[in-house]
């Protein structure tokens, strides 16, 4: 017979698996539709019209129209496409289900149109809202927080293709009764994360790792080099942290989301022309292209890092629906490659992984997630001790510093003013 503790853990196992599978399927459907629309906008349509897909006019035109389209969705859809991600953490309170259709449409348009944001925040919002709404109806005795945790874990597993990230994140957030062991509290979320990861793996495999030269034995000087790289990435990220609320406030003085997002899309188009097609979109496929291109110089990597960081700030400040983690990883990779080109004596594995650690730490203020992203992009077990050590001064630098979020004015409603 099972112990009562085991029976308690099993109570939510079936809902956890169902939520994990559903979270992954929602992500897959959204990404497939966005990919098809992206192919239409950036491959088939310019080819039919006889226009180069990297033409400045095409880049500016598509991104401007994308901004206008997203603005129209936010202006006229019920619920105004959910909350502004610039004002929200990755895992937030559930939104009304009526806001989800507009949010999904706004996300798909942004992903396909080349906006420098990832899918993580809107997908998380959608999955949490659905899990809470459906779960509360089917199992009303289970509180909303449990459904929120399960949906968050399933989404994280689906996004990253592994339950490891969910285990790391929730190990520091599930601060329940001290009488309940941590792994008892992690059981159902890990079931959801595993189900989400396995379901995603049936359709596609998230490809984060880069072909970076293998790092051998750790030296004491490598720790110092890694700490300096992380500090440089943090400094760059804190510039973005300073700019985001100020630009957000300035742009939203116009009140009309169609105008705000149209201008934001136009600015993103100009940045895209300067940075080229590799600086567009969420950044995961593009960072693979960046590493594969042997023609890039130190100045090219620097330009890409600056353009992508600026595009991230503009997209978030304008109110596009998307997450900041994936483009931040691109910025970290560009910074790391730039520093390696500038100082070849420091291995690229160190510069890239420590730059990712620093910039993701600024964006998420989550040590485990930052370590995870650095470790999966540069998969090398020799780096793990170094990354853990480098995390310490990086965390000290950011202690008490502002988050990469906008404080919502008290008079503003839960969703964008329109």
Curated annotation (Swiss-Prot):
NCBIfam families: PRK03655.1. It holds the Pfam family Voltage_CLC. It is a multi-pass membrane protein. InterPro entries: Chloride_channel_YfeO, Cl-channel_core, ClC, ClC-type_chloride_channel. It is found in: Cell membrane. GO terms for cellular component: plasma membrane. This is Putative ion-transport protein YfeO. Gene3D superfamilies: Clc chloride channel (1.10.3080.10). The gene is yfeO. The keyword DNA damage does not apply. It comes from the Bacteria. PANTHER family: CHLORIDE CHANNEL PROTEIN CLC-E, ION-TRANSPORT PROTEIN YFEO-RELATED. It comes from Escherichia coli (strain 55989 / EAEC). The keyword Cell membrane applies. Keywords: Cell membrane, Ion channel, Ion transport, Membrane, Transmembrane, Transmembrane helix, Transport. GO terms for molecular function: chloride transmembrane transporter activity; monoatomic ion channel activity. The chain crosses the membrane at residues 10-30, 54-74, 99-119, 120-140, 149-169, 186-206, 223-243, 258-278, 300-320, 322-342, 343-363, 371-391. Belongs to the chloride channel (TC 2.A.49) family.
């Amino acid at each position: 017979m099972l112990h009562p503790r085991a029976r308690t853990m099993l109570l939510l196992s079936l809902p956890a698996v169902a939520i994990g599978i559903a979270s992954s399927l929602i992500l897959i459907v959204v990404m497939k539709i966005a990919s098809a629309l992206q192919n239409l906008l950036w491959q088939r349509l310019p080819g039919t019209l006889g226009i180069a897909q990297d033409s400045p006019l095409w880049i500016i035109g598509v991104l401007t129209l994308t901004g206008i389209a997203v603005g129209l969705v936010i202006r006229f859809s019920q619920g105004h496409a959910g909350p502004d991600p610039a004002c929200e953490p990755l895992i937030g309170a559930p939104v009304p289900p009526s806001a989800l259709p507009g949010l999904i449409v706004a996300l798909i348009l942004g992903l396909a149109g080349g906006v420098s944001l990832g899918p993580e925040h809107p997908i998380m919002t959608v999955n949490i809202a659905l899990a809470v709404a459906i779960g509360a109806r089917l199992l009303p005795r289970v509180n909303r927080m449990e459904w929120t945790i399960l949906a968050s874990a399933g989404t994280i597993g689906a996004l990253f293709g592994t339950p490891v990230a969910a285990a790391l994140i929730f190990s520091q957030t599930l601060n329940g009764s001290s009488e309940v062991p941590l792994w008892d509290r992690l059981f159902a979320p890990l079931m959801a994360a595993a189900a989400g990861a396995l379901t995603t793996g049936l359709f596609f495999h998230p490809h984060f790792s880069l072909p970076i030269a293998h790092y051998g034995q750790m030296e004491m000087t490598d720790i110092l080099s890694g700490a300096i790289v992380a500090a440089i990435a943090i400094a760059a990220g804190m510039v973005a942290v300073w700019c985001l609320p100020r630009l957000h406030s300035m742009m939203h003085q116009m009140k009309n989301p169609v105008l705000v997002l149209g201008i934001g899309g136009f600015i993103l188009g100009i940045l895209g022309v300067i940075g080229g097609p590799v600086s567009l979109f969420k950044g995961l496929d593009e960072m693979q292209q960046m590493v594969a291109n042997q023609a890039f110089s130190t100045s090219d990597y620097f330009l890409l890092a600056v353009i992508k960081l600026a595009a991230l700030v503009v997209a978030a400040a304008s109110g596009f629906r998307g997450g900041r983690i994936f483009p931040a990883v691109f910025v970290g990779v560009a910074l790391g490659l730039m520093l390696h080109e500038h100082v070849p004596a420091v291995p690229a594995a160190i510069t890239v992984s420590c730059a990712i650690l620093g910039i993701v730490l600024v964006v998420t203020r989550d040590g485990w997630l930052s370590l995870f992203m650095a470790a999966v992009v540069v998969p090398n077990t020799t780096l793990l001790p170094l990354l853990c050590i480098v995390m310490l001064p990086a965390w000290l630098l950011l202690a008490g510093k502002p988050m990469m979020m906008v404080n919502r004015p008290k008079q503003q409603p839960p969703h964008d003013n329109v």
